Amino acid sequence: MKIVLIGAGNLATHLGKALLEAGHDIMQVYSRTMESASRLATRAGGAPVTDLRAVRRDAEVYIMAVKDSVLPELIPQLCKGMPESVFIHTAGSVPMDVFKGMALHYGVLYPMQTFSKEREVDFRGIPCFVEGNDKMAKEVITDLARSVSEKVYAMTSEKRRRLHLAAVFACNFTNHCYDIAHEILAKQGIPFEVMLPLIDETAAKVHDLSPREAQTGPALRFDENIIREQSMLLKDNPLMRDLYERLSLSINQFSKKKART
């Protein structure tokens, strides 16, 4: 397919490369800065542009891999006057109807993964969740997703919002906890790498056990002495201390749900 890629961030970088490897024609890469547009265009093909007025109007598909907050501003400028094209955004929490009244054929292709530009990922194994407003959009978006991923699922906007919420807990919040652990260790001169086997095993366990079955630690047992002592170690950081206590309470309450089932 002939594609124009709008955006040059982490997701756009990996998606652009995957589309190129799948045999698609990346005609242009748009970004607000020429540096970003050129960097991705070098890797994914196509011409870099920084002016929306310079975006070609003969592509089959326009993929908007940009910040969620940019879409309402970007869509009206880009979609008008191209009734034959399919417009796609890649956001987890933005409904498909953000295109309504602006484009004729539109939908969503949401790859659920955490992306960093310089870290390679196997796009074939990334779950991609798709939605289209009509038969043409559904077929184009599904075919596009299947060309880069072996795991493609149809999903409504409402379900995708919940999926993205779950992903925030499973990925973003978890990584923030790694950051907190890193800070605690750094103050004691302990390298973060000592945590890696623990982190790896924690992630590996949920391939075989449910998260609730895999839960361990003082909060599960509600060992009040340890919880109190560890909470006191955080007395100089009220936000971190509050987070520790709330997570401990949540873990204990979830464990009681398990006991009742």
Predicted feature residues:
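NAD(P)+-binding Rossmann beta1-loop-alpha1 motif at the extreme N-terminus of oxidoreductases
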Residues: 1-51
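Short phosphate-binding/catalytic loops that engage adenosine nucleotides
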Residues: 24-25, 104, 150, 190
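Hydrophobic Val/Ile/Leu positions in short beta-strands of Rossmann-like dinucleotide-binding domains
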Residues: 5-6, 64, 130
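Short, hydrophobic beta-strand segments that form beta-sheet elements in well-ordered domains
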Residues: 27-31, 86-91, 109, 128-130, ...
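Short active-site oxyanion
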Residues: 1, 24-28, 58-62, 82-87, ...
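Rossmann-like NAD(P)(H) cofactor-binding subdomain of soluble oxidoreductases
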Residues: 34, 38, 42-120
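Internal alpha-helical scaffold of NAD(P)-dependent oxidoreductase catalytic cores
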Residues: 36, 40-43, 120-165, 170-207, ...
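Interdomain hinge/lid region at the active-site interface
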Residues: 186, 200-261
